[in-house]
Amino acid sequence: MSINALFDEFKVKAATPKQQLAEYKAQGKKVIGVLPYYAPEELVYAAGMVPMGIWGSNNKTISRAKEYCATFYCTIAQLATICDTLRPMSQNFRVAMGDKMKVIFLAHPQNRFEEFGLKFCEEEYANVKADLEEVCGHEITNDAILDAIKVYNKSRAARREFVKLANEHCD
């Protein structure tokens, strides 16, 4: 497959997330919406589910965002990119959608180097893991988590290599 064919395929996938979601669901897969940037996608993947970013863009209509966000929220928050107004989004989802779906919150500690920060972080991930197990209906094993980490690390390495190569071809 040529590079241009790959780019064309990527453009279609990026422009049609609703279609991609429908394809996953048609395959019988559970899809978990994740807000950027700190969602533990590896845990979702290890559970056998698909992590799908809840993203937006400035060239998309965001009128439905007003159903979930206060009118004074900036479009950046409505489009689910990281900023101060993103912090309460999980609570907004919980209030608006909590009776329709499980909303899982993850608080990242500001200090992850002291013992108390590490303990807090470990407890937060354990809570997320337990919530995901409830959604997927089975235990997420340590082996599955390790395998998921390997998959994601390989993907990240490939993206870093792509950026390096793309930088050499700015023409």
Language-model-detected regions and their locations in the chain:
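A charged, amphipathic alpha-helical module
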Residues: M1-K30, E122, A126-D171
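Gly/lys/ser-thr-rich phosphate-binding loops in alpha/beta enzymes
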Residues: A70-N127, D131
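Short, well-ordered coil/turn elements that cap or connect secondary structure elements
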Residues: Q27, A46, G98-K100
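Short C-terminal domain-edge/linker segments immediately following a structured domain
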Residues: I62-Y68, P109-R112, V135-E139
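An N-terminal, globular interaction/scaffold subdomain
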Residues: G33, Y38-Q91
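Short amphipathic alpha-helical segments, especially helix-boundary/capping motifs
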Residues: A14-Q19, W55, K102-L106
